[in-house]
From Swiss-Prot:
Signal peptide: none
Organism ancestry: Eukaryota, Metazoa, Chordata, Craniata, Vertebrata
Keyword Transcription regulation tagged: no
InterPro entries hit by this protein: ARM-like, ARM-type_fold, DAD_dom, FH2_Formin, FH2_Formin_sf, FH3_dom, Formin_Homology, GBD/FH3_dom
Source organism (scientific name): Mus musculus (Mouse)
Name used for this protein in its record: Disheveled-associated activator of morphogenesis 1
Domain GBD/FH3, first and last residues per copy: 45-420
Chain intervals for the UniProt region annotation (Disordered): 457-478, 526-596, 1007-1033, 1056-1077
Domain DAD: 1026-1057
Any one GO cellular component localisation term in the record: presynapse
Assembly behavior: Interacts with CIP4, FNBP1 and FNBP1L. Interacts with the SH3 domains of Abl, BTK, endophilin, spectrin and SRC. Binds specifically to GTP-bound CDC42 and RHOA. Interacts with INTU; INTU mediates the indirect interaction between DAAM1 and NPHP4. Interacts (via coiled coil domain) with KANK1 (via coiled coil domain).
Length: 1077
């Protein structure tokens, strides 16, 4: 369908209110009683300064509703001309002051007229007065400043006019009042804001269309001009078609546009020589056909035109030629020219010159010829067949059946790809696109399904092969990476041991040289003097020297004498063994308390009793070697605001509002680790039905033959055919001795065995099948298990280091200790330390001012103000949450499982080495390489675990706890729970501060927003569109003359000025005089 853009170009020129080019000239209307003339007057007042004049002139220009271009032209005028225009406008406003200068007056009059249903009782003078009032409103809407129109719209003046139009009786509808009311709407649409308001109103176009029912020719002409102009507005074409459907129901028409064709055909009475109405009707019909979807869609133009042709418009057009009116002929020519072009283009689809749409035979033959030898032909025959079966009785719903069929076919033709109808469809929710989608040919669907199924199978096969190769590649890559990591670690360890070996070798050489030197000196000293008097039994030259070596400890000499002290060792050597205890004394046992001198604390005493902090004091005999020996809480008292602390946690003070909002300390739930369970193999018989069924399910999931499974086990699955989860399931179906014995008895019936039985039989032929399967499963799971264990070990190690080294934690404990000593009395006070579990009891102490405030909230506030470095606590203890999840007992079990599994694989490797090799068996080569790497990796894990346990023991003792009685999840869980409580309390404090600030900010902004809304409202009302009044008149004038459909746009531009200046019928338009500056 060829696009037709003839009308579009005319619109862009005429209806310039929707475009930014070709604006009409500025018209300035002045009223002097009932005559309009250009008033050239000399200003009576002296001209003010230029700055003041520009401000006054700007206010005047704002009321004229001008575009930016014309505003610039106005401001470019000389100062004298500006002052002359300003004085002339102000004088005119002074002369027209009165009640009629306010929109409220006209709205009251409209409501009063609408309330009076009949004009029969009215005197002629009263009727004339009301007509003048409506005419005055029309004039005011055209000539008053912009603020008048804006005020009229804000007061819902349009609804008042529409309500009057809907409720007027017959006499009023035939009077001049009706014509003037339509003129008011037309005048309102000359204004940009008014036009937008009319188009946006839900009922405006429908109510305007209802006025076509009047016999008043001038009213009909005005209505048709408005509707035709609205067709040219973006989105207005469909509104007009909807309005005509509305009028069909309102006027009880048989079909749409029936009244228009009837009026067009009337030629008797007052319609005999009436050309203006016929011109307006043809102008409207051309606008309906050529605008909206008709600009692009040939089918839509044919659809609408056929509706007019079915109403008999063509004979009427032939009769209208008798009027010999140039303007009417112009519209008639456009209608026929457009029809001829469309019918010619439509005929080209069938390779014809013309199609007789009046001939049912020709249209049927063209349709039959087009569909013959196509897949649609059977459906065409079915349509004809069912049309023959359609009921044809004169009574009943026969016409409605054909009407439904007609409307369905119309929708098929004119609906676009999105299922949208450019016309107002009488079939609601009828989307052709969705219907066609459901009626796709079944054969094509079947073919597509078969092709899709075939491609799906091929895709699945290729996907399985790809996944198999990817698994193989990933396994090889992982083994290579693990091997490289292990080799690098072995290299580092070897270099380290080599360096240590050299150092030890050098130390041995140095010690040997010292030993020879001491022997030489001892021999030299023993020869002249003989045995020592204090050592009966002869000299022991080797007893003193032997103490230099670490293995044997130095024995006690007879008589309880002390042995000689060992000589000093060279730098860097190992430490000497401990000396013997003093004579007659014994070393104290390891657990005995060591006396520690503790100075008495000088703790300030509160003036009133305080609420107690329920902590657990650490005994003084357990302070040695802990963090509490490094803490001095007495200096904290110099920083704390003790009066505020006493006031907040007084034991007798009444409750009142405080600075922290209601919050509850949340207790962290204990974290339960999942216990590892050992693989249990069901002891079932081979012939058991359930066991055989489960085995068959497993084999169907594997999608491997018995030979492929056997090859994978012998080669240690070098092609990655057996996933880890499948290996775990295969371990459940290891043939037991009873199964093997039973299968051996029936081995001669191998071909007749069931699938599960044959699988178990063939697997039993593999030497050490179960041990091989377990080794393969351990090999595949080893890296995963090590990867699970290492983060747990690392969490314990890093968590222990963090709590031991954290300065923020140490400072926090110091502050908490000061709080407790100040708040507690008697046995609960005067503490030098407390158990770390007491940290999670801080929140149990409630404030006496507000029960929702806890000691923890207060502590955080003090820390933020006095000890800001403590806020880095969560950063210094970042690994604590992970360490709190580690259960040492379960971790030891996992390490033990790895150790025993590795030992079992080594045992099987030794057994397989002793067996004669079988073809395709790669167990020895693959497992030997695996054992080398796995052993080193496991030893590395064990070293890390030993280091982690040592650091954990050190951390536990650092806080005064007993290492053997507390586990990592319990120890680190205390800190984790405390960190969570601190974060929550800190957030609650922050939320309270934000809420308080928000309330203050909202209060400040409330007044500002109120002032701003008032200012915006004034600006919005004062803001005026960039279009000139009178543009809607230009559009109607162009429609009336037919120039909107003219191909020659230059002619339209040349005639525009002439049309706008032409004085038209005084009953429809008043003269307009332009000011050209």
């Amino acid at each position: 369908m060829a696009p037709r853009k003839r009308g579009g170009r005319g619109i862009s020129f005429i209806f310039c209110c929707f475009r930014n080019n070709d604006h009409p000239e500025i018209t300035y209307r002045l009223r002097n009683d009932s005559n309009f003339a250009l008033q050239t007057m000399e200003p009576a007042l002296p001209m003010p300064p230029v700055e003041e004049l520009d401000v006054m002139f700007s206010e005047l220009v704002d009321e004229l509703d001008l575009t930016d271009k014309h505003r610039e032209a106005m401001f470019a005028l000389p100062a004298e001309k500006k002052w002359q225009i300003y004085c002339s406008k102000k004088k005119d406003q002074e002369e027209n002051k009165g009640a009629t200068s306010w929109p409220e007056f006209y709205i009251d009059q409209l409501n009063s007229m609408a309330a009076r249903k009949s004009l029969l009782a009215l005197e002629k003078e009263e009727e004339e007065e009301r007509s003048k009032t409506i005419e005055s409103l029309k004039t005011a809407l055209r000539t008053k400043p912009m603020r008048f129109v804006t005020r009229f719209i804000d007061l819902d003046g349009l609804s008042c006019i529409l309500n009057f139009l809907k409720t007027m009786d017959y006499e009023t509808s035939e009077s001049r009042i009706h014509t003037s009311l339509i003129g008011c709407i037309k005048a309102l649409m000359n204004n940009s804001q008014g036009r937008a308001h009319v188009l946006a109103h839900s009922e405006s176009i429908n109510v305007i269309a209802q006025s076509l029912s009047t016999e008043n020719i001038k009213t009909k002409v005005a209505v048709l001009e408005i509707l035709g102009a609205v067709c040219l507005v973006p989105g207005g074409h469909k509104k007009v078609l909807q309005a005509m459907l509305h009028y069909q129901k309102y006027a009880s028409e048989r079909t749409r546009f029936q009244t228009l064709i009837n009026d067009l055909d009337k030629s008797t009475g007052r319609y005999r020589d009436e050309v203006s109405l016929k011109t307006a009707i043809m102008s409207f019909i051309n606008a309906v056909l050529s605008q909206g979807a008709g600009v692009e869609s040939l089918d839509f133009r044919l659809h609408l035109r056929y509706e007019f042709l079915m109403l008999g418009i063509q004979p009427v057009i032939d009769k209208l030629r008798e009027h010999e009116n140039s303007t009417l002929d112009r519209h008639l020519d456009f209608f026929e020219m457009l029809r001829n072009e469309d019918e010619l283009e439509f005929a080209k689809r069938f390779e014809l010159v013309h199609i007789d749409t009046k001939s049912a035979t020709q249209m049927f033959e063209l349709t039959r010829r087009r569909l013959t030898h196509s897949e649609a032909y059977p459906h065409f025959m079915s349509i004809l067949h069912h049309c023959l079966q359609m009921p044809y009785k004169r009574s009943g719903n026969t016409v409605q059946y054909w009407l439904l069929l007609d409307r369905i076919i119309q929708q098929i033709v004119i609906q676009n790809d999105k299922g949208q109808d450019p016309d107002s469809t009488p079939l609601e929710n009828f989307n052709i696109k969705n219907v066609v989608r459901m009626l796709v040919n079944e054969n094509e669907v079947k073919q597509w399904k078969e092709q899709a199924e075939k491609m799906r199978k091929e895709h699945n096969e290729l996907q399985q092969k790809l996944e198999k190769k990817e698994r193989e590649c990933d396994a090889k890559t992982q083994e290579k990476e693990e091997m490289m990591q292990t080799l690098n670690k072995m290299k580092e360890k070897l270099e380290k041991e080599t360096t240590e070996h050299k150092q030890v070798k050098q130390q041995v050489a140095d010690l040997t040289a010292q030993l020879h030197e001491l022997n030489r000196r001892a021999v030299c000293a023993a020869v002249p003097g003989g045995p020592s008097p204090g050592a009966p039994g002869g000299p022991f030259p080797s007893s003193g020297l032997g103490s230099l070596l670490p293995p044997p400890p130095p024995p006690l000499l007879s008589g309880g004498a002390l042995p000689p002290p060992p000589p000093p060792l060279p730098p860097g050597g190992p430490p000497p063994p401990p000396g013997p205890p003093p004579l007659g004394g014994v070393l104290p046992p390891p657990g005995a308390p060591v006396s520690l001198t503790l100075k008495k604390k000088n703790i300030p005493q509160p003036t009133n009793a305080l609420k107690s902090f329920n902590w657990s004091k650490l005994p003084e005999n357990k302070l040695d070697g802990t963090v509490w020996t490094e803490i001095d809480d007495t200096k904290v008292f110099k920083i704390l605001d003790l009066e505020d602390l006493e006031r907040t946690f007084s034991a007798y003070q009444r409750q009142q509002e405080f600075f922290v909002n209601n919050s509850k300390q949340k207790e962290a739930d204990a974290i339960d680790d999942t216990l590892s369970s050992k693989l249990k193999v069901k002891e079932l018989s081979v012939i058991d039905g359930r066991r055989a069924q489960n085995c068959n399910i497993l084999l169907s999931r594997l999608k491997l033959s018995n030979d492929e499974i056997k090859r994978a086990i012998l080669t240690m699955d070098e092609q990655e055919d057996l996933p880890k989860d499948m290996l775990e399931q295969l371990l459940k179906f290891v043939p037991e001795k009873s199964d093997i014995d039973l299968l051996e008895e029936h081995k001669h019936e191998l071909d007749r065995m069931a699938k599960a039985d044959r699988f178990l039989f063939e697997m039993s032929r593999i030497n050490h099948y179960q041990q091989r399967l377990q080794s393969l499963y351990f090999k595949k799971k080893f890296a995963e298990r090590v990867a699970e264990v290492k983060p747990k070990v690392e969490a314990i190690r890093s968590g222990s280091e963090e709590v031991f080294r954290s300065r923020a934690l140490k400072q926090l404990l110091e502050v908490v200790l000061a709080f407790g000593n100040y708040m507690n009395k008697g046995q609960r006070g005067n503490a030098y330390g407390f158990k770390i579990s007491s940290l999670n009891k801080i929140a149990d102490t409630k404030s006496s001012i507000d029960k929702n405030i806890t000691l923890l909230h207060y502590l955080i506030t003090i820390v933020e103000n006095k000890y800001p470095k403590v806020l880095n606590l969560s950063e210094e203890l970042r690994d604590i949450p992970q360490a709190a999840k580690v259960n040492m007992t379960e971790l030891d079990k996992e390490i033990s499982t790895l150790r025993s599994g590795l030992k079992a694989v080594e045992t099987e490797l030794e057994y397989q080495k002793s067996q004669p090799p079988q073809p395709g068996d790669k167990f020895v080569s693959v497992v030997s390489q695996f054992i080398t790497l796995a052993s080193f990796s496991f030893s590395d894990v064990e070293d890390l675990l030993a280091e982690a346990k040592e650091l954990f023991t050190k951390a536990v003792k650092h806080f005064g706890e007993e290492a053997g009685k507390i586990q990592p999840d319990e120890f680190f869980g205390i800190f984790d729970q405390f960190l969570q409580a601190v974060a929550e309390a800190k957030q609650e404090n922050e939320n309270m501060r934000k809420r308080k600030e928000e309330e203050e900010r909202r209060a400040r902004l409330e007044a500002q927003l109120k002032e701003q809304r008032e200012r915006e409202r004034k600006v919005r009302k004062a803001k005026e569109s960039s279009e000139e009044s009178g543009e809607f008149d230009d559009l109607v004038s162009a429609l009336r003359s037919g120039e909107v459909f003219d191909k020659d746009l230059s002619k339209l531009k040349r005639n525009r000025k002439r049309i706008s200046n032409q004085v038209t019928d005084s009953s429809r338009e008043r003269p307009i005089t332009k000011l050209n500056f």
